[in-house]
Every structure is written in C-alpha cells, then in structure tokens.
C-alpha cells in the first residue's frame, strides 16, 4: 500500500503481540515505514477522525457478532467524514464446492462468528455501522471459500 501511495502514513493495530512482531518484521523487510500499536478493534487506540482509510484483511470473520458490530463502529469513529473502509473477508460461498470448503473456516472460527459471512451479510453489517455507498468490488474463489472485497464511505457530517 505504501509503495503505491508514497507519502501515505501507515498505522497497524492488533491485539496479538506475535502478529504485531510479524507485521513489524514484514514492514522492515519491505523497507516500509509504519507504526504498529497493540489494541483491540472494538476500542481502537486512536482519536476520532484520525484516518482517511481503514483497511482490513481476513479479520472480521474471527469476531463474535457483537464484537464485529463494535469493530465496524470503531472503524467509522476513527475515520474522517468522507473517509473509506476497505474490507477483504469471507462472503457467501458462490457454489456448493465453495460452501463445503468454507466449512473448514467455520469449524475453526466458529459457526456464530462466521454466520453473517456465510449468509452474505457483511455488507449489511458495514451499512448498519453507519457507512454509505457500501458495495462489493470483487469476489474470488479460493481454497477456503469465497473472498469478498468491499468498501464503504463514512458520510460527511451534517451541517448545522
């Protein structure tokens, strides 16, 4: 991301110290300057309106439904008005074989955590968190199910 957009400031957050260390090592190998912070998606350690973009990859399916909703609301909170969320995560399997493959993910991460994904409801959850213009840009068949790439925009604040 930073290579495609020189001058962008990159921040990463994860609750797992091992994942943070892995991210730091990957950034260092790639020669990318980034800031990594330990924290939880449901209570991000950043002020309101701190970012222009929030990007998440294969994260939301790990969360329980209430935590998923809280994390999406937090993403909206830390975005500036007009800021964008970009998510790549599991979506509704696009056929019987992909439904069967996705069963492995559901067994590992929990049927409750992945129910909204299996039903294709992640875009609805993003909208319910306050994002507008939510759309799915691409769907990819993988060895573990169907990966959806979607985005939404935090609406501009209403003028008084």
Language-model region placement:
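Class I SAM-dependent methyltransferase SAM/SAH-binding core
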Residues: 1-43
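A short SAM/SAH-binding and catalytic strip from SAM-dependent methyltransferases
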Residues: 53-67
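A short acidic, Gly/Pro-enriched loop at the edge of an enzyme's catalytic core
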Residues: 42-54
């Amino acid at each position: 991301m930073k290579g495609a957009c020189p001058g962008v400031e990159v921040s990463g957050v994860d609750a797992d110290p091992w994942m943070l260390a892995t991210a730091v090592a990957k950034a260092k190998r790639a020669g990318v300057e980034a800031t990594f912070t330990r924290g939880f998606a449901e209570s991000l350690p950043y002020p309101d309106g701190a970012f222009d973009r929030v990007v998440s990859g294969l994260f939301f399916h790990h969360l329980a439904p209430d935590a998923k909703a809280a994390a999406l609301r937090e993403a909206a909170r830390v975005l500036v008005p007009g800021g964008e969320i970009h998510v790549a995560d599991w979506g509704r399997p696009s056929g019987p074989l992909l439904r069967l493959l996705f069963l492995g993910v559901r067994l590992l991460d929990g049927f409750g955590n992945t129910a909204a994904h299996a039903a294709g409801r992640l875009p609805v959850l993003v909208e319910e968190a306050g994002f507008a213009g939510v759309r799915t840009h691409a769907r990819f068949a993988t060895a573990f199910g169907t990966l959806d790439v979607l985005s939404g925009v935090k609406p501009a604040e209403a003028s008084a």
